[in-house]
A protein has these predicted regions:
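Structural motif
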Residues: 51-65, 155-157
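Extended hydrophobic packing segments that form well-structured cores
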Residues: 375-466
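Short, well-structured alpha-helical segments in soluble
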Residues: 59-72, 89-91, 259-268
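Short beta-strand segments enriched in small/hydrophobic residues
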Residues: 2-25, 174-183
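Short catalytic helix/loop segments, enriched in acidic residues and glycine
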Residues: 24-40
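Periplasmic-binding protein-like
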Residues: 72-82, 100-102, 271-276
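Long, internal scaffold/assembly segments composed of regular secondary structure
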Residues: 231, 235-323
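Cap/lid and interdomain-hinge subdomains that line or gate substrate/regulatory clefts
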Residues: 44-45, 103, 108-243
Length: 466
């Protein structure tokens, strides 16, 4: 999914007031911290040690080198000793990437029997980090602050979470969204200022005529289509529901052809997310369903009915969770209908076709069923129920004067009974702290009916991204 192996620079602040021996210790301690962080196995990206920063010029130079290194996704700063914060102003003013302030110290415990003023001067992060933190706050620079000993797994976990957010921020500046169709007519929340999105978020949002992309679909060879259909038949349960087997396979093959054609178009033109709309399908024989689900599982973002904002968020949230151990999945989602029985409240989540199978719990089936919208033949889709457990639903909306990111923690549950007549993938969740409060707050905030949903991210991470 990612085209580069991102790294994070570790910048240690000090000053020349304490002498060469002290500065040698500072450098040695910083190297030990970096080596141990990398060996811990708890961080998703490599930390790179940089020489101790003690002058205005070197600080400014290092921050600009970080700006210009495409593999650097952010910097971690730490003041081992006192480091006069005015020395950091020029560098911080010009820095353009995510920033984490690690408020730690080399030693975990005060050496009660041997501590003297040399030790105090050398190990005064409690002093130096406050000086540095003050200037960052005064300059109005957004950053993450993580406090605690660097060897503590809880501290490492918070660094790891921030790293994923930082990569989301950096990748956001390169996201390219393909609009296969315009927004659904008369729908408000899927609209938005695409120019402002490029200015504020870095997103490129381009539209192409549906039939230009349909030409790529039509150009897919029969051999390639058959090979992908065979893969589907090996991976998923085939749920004929009384349909003729040959006719069923032909419908599935249409989706295979769409998957291959769409992906070739997106790879050729370097797009990372895609939107479709059932009201504008051109020469496509079916509304893309199974095809979109498969593309989402590969890491592409998706939004229904032209919802490019949600498509970009799904892409970014997939990037942020890439390589995560025991990941449970990320998907495009839509609020559909409520269960309002006291004690059993929740929202049944689904969409017409395009929920990502990364969130599936148990077997995944292929169905071909009629779709009342789109005026095309019956589309094939993957059907499943989602995993249980905590997650987040995120909605980026355009309020006219600014964008707003709305995040709700949710608790995914199993539905009480099977739903044999519902031919789509589903999730069922209760918003935190409860359905009534969550729904009221969501509506007051202007949240959309579409969301980018993930089991693997937190509200804190998405708030940091925003």
């Amino acid at each position: 999914m990612l085209k580069k192996a991102y790294k994070f620079w570790f910048l240690t602040g000090s000053q020349d007031l304490y002498g060469d021996e002290c500065l040698a210790h500072v450098a040695e301690h910083s190297k030990i911290i970096v080596e141990n962080l990398n060996r811990s196995g708890n961080l998703p990206y490599e930390v790179v040690w940089k020489p101790t920063l003690i002058t205005d010029a070197l600080i400014r130079q290092t921050f600009n080198e970080a700006n210009n290194d495409p593999d650097c996704a952010g910097v971690i700063t730490w003041m081992h000793t006192f480091s006069p914060a005015k020395s950091w102003i020029a560098g911080l003013r010009e820095y353009r990437k995510p920033l984490l302030h690690l408020h730690t110290q080399f030693n975990e415990e005060i050496p009660y029997d041997t501590i003297d003023m040399d030790f105090m001067n050398e190990n005064q992060s409690a002093h130096g980090d406050r000086e540095y933190g003050h200037i960052v706050t005064r300059m109005g620079i957004e950053r993450k602050v993580v406090a605690g000993h660097w060897s503590d797994e809880r501290v490492q976990s918070r660094i790891a979470s921030w790293m994923r957010t930082a990569v989301g921020i950096v990748e956001s500046r390169n996201v390219r969204i393909l609009r296969v169709a315009d927004n659904m007519r008369n729908v408000a929340v899927t609209e938005g200022d695409k120019v402002e999105a490029q200015i504020k978020l870095g997103w490129t949002v381009d539209a192409y005529p549906v039939n230009e992309i349909a030409e790529y679909v039509a150009a897919v060879s029969q051999a390639d289509t058959d090979a992908l259909v065979d893969e589907y038949y090996q991976m998923y349960d085939i749920l004929l529901d009384g349909r003729d087997e040959k006719e069923f396979r032909r419908h599935v093959a249409v989706q295979a052809q769409i998957e291959l054609g769409f992906e070739r178009f997106m790879v050729e033109k370097d797009y990372h997310a895609i939107v479709t709309h059932f009201g504008d399908l051109g020469a496509l024989k079916q509304l893309p369903g199974l095809a979109i689900q498969r593309l989402e599982e590969k890491g592409y973002g998706f939004g229904g009915e032209g919802d490019w904002k949600t498509a970009a968020m799904v892409r970014l949230m997939k990037v942020m969770t890439e390589g995560m151990k025991d990941a449970k999945g990320t998907s495009f989602m839509e609020d559909y209908t409520y269960n309002l029985v006291p004690g059993k409240e929740g929202i049944l989540e689904a969409h017409m076709l395009e929920v990502c199978p990364s969130i599936a719990d148990g077997p995944i089936g292929v169905k071909v069923q009629p779709l009342s919208m789109g005026d095309r033949e019956d589309p094939a889709r993957l059907v499943f129920t989602s995993k249980t457990g905590p997650g987040i639903a995120a909605s980026l909306v355009d309020l006219g004067t600014r964008f707003r990111l709305i995040i709700n923690s949710v608790d995914c549950k199993k539905v009480e009974k099977p739903m044999p007549k519902l031919p789509v993938a589903t999730a069922f969740w209760t918003p935190e702290p409860n359905l009534k409060t969550g729904a009221e707050a969501w509506i007051l905030a202007g949240g959309a009916h579409h969301t980018a949903f993930s089991y693997d991210l937190t509200a804190e991470q998405m708030g940091d991204w925003a």
